[in-house]
């Protein structure tokens, strides 16, 4: 909480571990976490808390959970593992959005099918994963720089994308290795920074640890200063699988990012 407060970041997501995974109950908070105190502390620092939760677990007590956690001061949910795109999944997403909106909660939906405009109907859906994001490098070895200059031309046509960029342990293809507990990215740090401009993400993560971010103050301050909503977006140049250069304007300031 102190880290985002120092860098002017709006939210912290309490990821897996705040609730009892064996209980399968969104209302079951582990005894080691004092959620009301965390909310109080975060509010005092100007930071909002969001909770990660499995989609069907939230749905099982949707009204109760949204009412309780909104009353507690939680700002929203990062919903995960929908993992299907049939009618039931679509109905689930709309149901989650509708009830969350009634309680003024935002949603970042992971493990979900490609967006189809739900965020127009429910603007409280601030982002969708629906992409082979950076977390995949924890357990696999794909060519991520190639992927990064491919999916913006395809997937981003349908809506914003929560790719979770911001890795500060950067490696060449030859130096990269799979490391679940101490993960690294492929490509340069500049590549990671440029992703914050190129990838459309009204809610965007910083995926690495605060200690790594604090070790590169200038780079981290720059990322933290970037807007997440822009007035104008222009793709200046690009070729699928080769490169993309994007310029985005907020008020009177232009931001330009390029990936190869």
Positions of predicted regions on the chain:
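Core alpha-helical transmembrane segments of integral membrane proteins
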Residues: 8-14
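Short acidic/polar active-site loop segments enriched in Thr and Asp
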Residues: 10, 75, 204
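Carbohydrate-binding surface patches
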Residues: 240-260
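Aromatic- and carboxylate-enriched substrate-binding clefts and catalytic-loop regions
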Residues: 15-188
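An acidic-aromatic substrate-binding cleft motif
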Residues: 1-7
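Extended hydrophobic/aromatic segments used for targeting, binding, or gating
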Residues: 30-36, 40, 228-241
């Amino acid at each position: 909480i102190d880290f985002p407060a120092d860098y002017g970041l709006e939210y912290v997501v309490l990821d897996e571990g705040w609730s009892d995974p064996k209980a399968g109950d969104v209302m079951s908070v582990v005894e080691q976490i004092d959620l009301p105190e965390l909310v109080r502390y975060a509010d005092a620092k100007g930071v909002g808390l969001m909770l990660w939760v499995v989609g069907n677990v939230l749905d099982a007590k949707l009204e109760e959970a949204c009412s309780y956690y909104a009353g507690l001061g939680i700002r929203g949910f990062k919903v995960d593992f929908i993992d299907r795109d049939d009618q039931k999944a679509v109905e689930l997403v709309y149901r989650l959005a509708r009830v969350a909106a009634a309680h003024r909660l935002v949603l970042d939906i992971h493990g979900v099918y490609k967006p189809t405009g739900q965020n127009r109907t429910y603007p409280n859906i601030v982002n969708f994963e629906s992409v082979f994001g950076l977390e995949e490098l924890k357990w696999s070895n794909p060519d991520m720089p190639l992927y990064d200059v491919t999916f913006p031309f395809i997937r981003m046509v349908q809506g914003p994308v929560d790719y979770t960029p911001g890795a500060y342990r950067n490696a060449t293809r030859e130096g990269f290795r799979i490391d679940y507990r101490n993960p690294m990215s492929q490509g340069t740090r500049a590549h990671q920074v440029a992703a914050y401009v190129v990838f459309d993400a009204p809610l965007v993560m910083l995926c690495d640890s605060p200690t790594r971010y604090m070790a590169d103050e200038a780079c981290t301050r720059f990322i933290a200063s970037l807007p997440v909503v822009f007035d104008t977006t222009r793709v200046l140049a690009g070729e699928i699988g080769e490169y993309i250069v994007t310029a985005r304007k907020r008020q009177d300031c232009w931001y330009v990012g390029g990936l190869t």
